[in-house]
Amino acid sequence: ITPDMDWQRFFRFKALLDRYQVKPLIGVVPDNRDENLRGSSESRKDAPADFYAYIRGLQEEGWSVALHGMNHVYSTKKGGLFPLNDFSEYAGKPYEEQKEMIARGKQILEEHDVHTDLFMAPAHSYDRNTLRALKENGFQALTDGFGEQPYLWQGLTFYPISFRLSDTLKKKKGYSTMVVHTGTIQENELAGYE
């Protein structure tokens, strides 16, 4: 989520989560430069006056927060280790650049007293340099993994994501991270989640 996103859609989805007492993991983009994540001025009118105070409040309610990149801008045409997309904010960039981007994103969150050791890669794309940079910056886990259970690899815990939500919801066992882009969610999708 971002300070400049479509808050009306977010609050509608949050009401659904609250109704069913779901405490989600959310990805926070500390310096959003992705126009696709920005809501209209009308949809931002209900935005919290202090974005980071709001995020801290969600954490106090039991929500988990992940660093969701730095700017959420796809500047490479690399998919990295997770073959879902062929573009990335991180994959394909030199280690030092990735390390600096991750450090800066974490610093922005911590300057606002938001602390996390979870990472959510924009476009689910990362490479070995990303993993190394995450560990160097104190991260313990990321959301973009395979399978049905969290697992340890390269010194990090990976939480599996759902490739096809309908298939994931039919499973009788296992764990998965559902990806919901609340800023662009449509009415029929809201009804489906209900």
Feature map (PLM): residue ranges:
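The substrate-binding groove and active-site-proximal loops of carbohydrate-active enzymes
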Residues: 1-5, 37-46, 87-96, 179-185
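Active-site beta->alpha N-cap acidic-glycine motif
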Residues: 1-64, 108, 115, 191
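Hydrophobic faces of well-ordered beta-strands that scaffold small-molecule active sites
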Residues: 24-26, 65-68, 116-119, 141-144, ...
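Active-site groove signature of glycoside hydrolases
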Residues: 1-4, 66, 70, 84-86, ...
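Catalytic grooves of carbohydrate-active enzymes
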Residues: 3, 19-20, 112, 137, ...
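Catalytic domains of cell-wall/extracellular-matrix polysaccharide-remodeling enzymes
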Residues: 89-164, 187, 191
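Short, flexible, mixed-charge acidic loops at enzyme active sites
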Residues: 73-85
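Active-site beta-loop-alpha junctions enriched in small/polar residues
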Residues: 1, 29-31, 70-72, 146-147, ...
